[in-house]
Amino acid sequence: MRDFMAIGRSVAVAERGMAATSHPQATLAAVEMLKAGGNAVDAAVAAVAVQGVVEPQMTGIGGDCFALYSPKAGAPIALNGSGRTPAGTDAGKYSGSGARDIPPTAPEAVTVPGAIDAWCRLVADRSEERRVGK
């Protein structure tokens, strides 16, 4: 039996897929996605969506997403799902003001979260690779 007071992790062995997160429910979501025929991206998105519920202080739909994915064929893919400036922002207001930085507590420092768009792009772009677990 595992001693949860001891430092370290349990040994994990798998033949067809593996998932690890900071929360058991998120890991279970990833494993279930793989069992259902999803690929690594599907599993990662399922896990992070669950983490937004079970660990909202750590991750969620209001944040960003950065991914480096290496498909079986082709070059690795990098995705920058960082927040964007709102569409109605006037860039000239900032460049002509002489300000060097936007104060972090100013309303202008807020970005539109990029996580959900990044998750959707990752899943859509990898849809042809849904063969893991079958």
Which stretches of residues belong to each language-model region?
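Noncatalytic scaffold domains of N-terminal-nucleophile
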Residues: 1-28, 32, 40-134
